[in-house]
Amino acid sequence: MIAAPADLASLIKAQAYGLGFDLVGVTTLGPAETAPDFDEWLSHGYAGEMDYLQRGAEKRRDTRLPFPGAVSAIVVGLNYGGTAPNGPVARYARGDDYHDVMCKRLESLHGWLEQEAGRAVRGKSYVDTGPILERDFARRAGLGWFGKNTNLINPDLGSFFFIGALLVDLELEADAPFEVERCGSCTRCLEACPTSAFVEPGVLDATRCISYLTIEAKGEIPGEFREAVGDLLYGCDVCQSVCPWNARFGQELREAGFQPREAIAGRDARTLAREILAMDEAAFRTSFKGSAMKRAKRRGLARNAAVVLGNVGDHTDEPALVVALEHDEGIVREHAAWALGQIRRTGPPTLE
């Protein structure tokens, strides 16, 4: 016999915490409350090259559409290290691919739920992998509020956590949504953005965001933003790292799978950039197998690496960039030429 919705929800939460999730909440399915905002955001072109967001827009507007028959969503959060220092690679991508880590645990939760229910439970897991508005689910499940930097902020964890959802065909008691926005008058995230990517509080123009430019954008990084990229090779944590909620409540990384991988650990921006520029396709696949960084592909990471070396401005990096002028990807050659120009305009290296 299946437990009552309230009892089953409590059992699910206990099991999810036991699997290592840091946050768990439950919500019902229906029209997404943020759908109008999402549509307006798309209409302004703020999604840039992320055409998949437009293609899945209809399903994102109603949380019942992605997985017909589902009536409840179990929403989870998993910390990825709010106290770690900033670096050339965004915190979320330094370890194993979060999609793999989260999905495996949600699948385990699904399997346990079927045993607990005593019947087959139709369910589907989403970890940034399908047409759902994860933040909408999470706020409705009581996990946090939308910060001015557009990230979901939890009062006990900050914002450095992944969001996942398991949609199921079971009626569960829903948690109260998080109704109070607690950013107050703080605007640190808006002011700290290197490219002024926030149109207004809570609205991000992705085409100006360093995370978008170094990961999602497949073409050239516009000249107006290259210097602002600085030594950020993949992604950007600036708007989160300055947030007082992360300063006060950000937690240390406990998940072994999210510890920095060998290809990243202990390497500064210059070292990592030179190594990436020198990689052929086989070396790239070996180094970034099972990493979220593979999303940018070799050409994207090499493009970023050239920009980073140009911004660092060390003349000893010129040989690596000269070699990159013969790179098999034209976009890398172009950015390498730009980087050499940046370095050489500072004059010849000082000989001691």
What are these regions (language model features)?
Residues 1-182, 221, 230:
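Auxiliary alpha/beta "docking" domains used to position bulky ligands
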Residues 231, 274, 303-307, 322:
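Amphipathic alpha-helical repeat scaffolds
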Residues 298, 328-330:
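Short inter-helical turns and helix N-cap capping residues of alpha-solenoid HEAT/ARM repeat scaffolds
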Residues 212-228, 244-279:
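A beta-strand-loop signature enriched in Asp, Gly, Thr, and Trp
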Residues 283-287, 314-326, 345-352:
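Amphipathic alpha-helical scaffolding segments comprising HEAT/armadillo-like alpha-solenoid repeats
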Residues 302-313, 334-345:
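Structural detector for internal amphipathic alpha-helices that build alpha-solenoid repeat scaffolds
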Residues 18-21, 188-212, 218, 232-258, ...:
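Iron-sulfur cluster-binding cysteine motifs and their immediate structural context
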